[in-house]
Amino acid sequence: MSDTRMLAAALANRSAHAVLGIVSAVDPSNHAIKVRIQPDNVETGWIPDVGGVQAGNLRVSCPSEPGTHVALLPLEGDGEHLIAIGAVFDTVVTAPVSPSDGQAIQPGSMLIRAGCGAPPTETNGKVGDVNPQAGWCQIGSDGVILGAGNARLHIAESGISLTIGDVTAAFSANGLKVSGGDIQTDQHSLTQHVHLMGSQTTGGPVG
């Protein structure tokens, strides 16, 4: 008599189930990918890449990159028809840190950051170089922060601040304040302009 536990285990192993794989090719125009299923490294055909997607009147597209670790789910239990349901972090491609404070993003917040370094396409490869000029967006309890390179825009309940290098422009209920730089038009400078008094000129602005 066969052990029913062995039969159940054999049946479970024959049933299609969620698997992990590594993206091997990308077709951005059709939002499709090929994936090498682990651990056997068998490559799929072109399958839908739905990670980070919204389809409809509002559309969001974030194609996976070669080397991305993705989770695959069989459609209607058919192991020959898979769909990528999302990407996962691993020990090589780790969660990004916030350029705002250098910490991993915490629950209740969201971070979108480009230029973190492309995933390795080989098993012994390394993550690509980080691009410090790439854009990022962080949403949290302290407002919304947009950044790229050394520029940063912070929208909070108390006001809006724009920082580029050492220059900051802060707009709040008290007005607009600029620190660390000058305010200029195409013809005049606030800190360096003077006024004519007959044939003489005044000094620079005071206060």
How would you describe each model-predicted region?
Residues G56-V70:
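Short nucleic-acid-contacting surface segments enriched for D/E, G, S/T with interspersed K/R
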Residues L73-L75:
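Short, surface-exposed secondary-structure boundary micro-motifs
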Residues M1-V19:
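Short boundary/loop segments of OB/S1/cold-shock single-stranded nucleic-acid-binding domains
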Residues P39-W46:
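Flexible glycine/proline-rich, aromatic-decorated loop/lid segments
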Residues S29-V35:
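Short aromatic-glycine-enriched beta-strand elements
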